[in-house]
Amino acid sequence: HALAAFGHDRAGPGTPFVGIEAPVVPPPEDCPRFRDGPPAEVDWPVRPPFPFWAEVLDGRAALGHAPWDPEPRGAAENASWMRFDQPPHDGAGAFDELALLVVADMMPGSVFEVMPYRPDESSWFAPSIDLTVHLRSVPSGEWILTHNIAHWLEDGYASAECRIWDLHAEHGPQLCAWATQVMLFSERRR
């Protein structure tokens, strides 16, 4: 099931503000590409090409770890640069902001920051129970930054939020979308 509510710009009281800040991350060209996959010496159940990353999005890890990296981790947080290979456009030729729904549904990576992959253990997958996305603005350039933060993981469920940023907007970083997700965390046997 899907529920959508649409609105348009309108005048309102108060001074506009965004009460969160974009993370400070390296530029996309300095970040590892998801398309390249894990190094050959890493025991990872899937090898490139990964169809989604090879055919739809160029994703690059800007904050956090690659899923196959077994190193100890810190906060349940990650950020990734994303660029569509063929940017979706609406009928008028403008970037279709509904495409942001695709990148908003990548929050499980923030949970994996606190539960790293171990080749001798089961892997996990996390289908959505609830995904709510608030679209705010259309990105101005080809690269957008997703910043994901997990809030809790317990009893087979997890909750996270995603902030989608345009760091190259004319007047500084601009929040393009904000999303929340509750996911079912399940074990997948190898």
Descriptions of predicted regions:
Residues H1-R190:
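Terminal targeting signals and extreme-terminal segments of soluble enzymes
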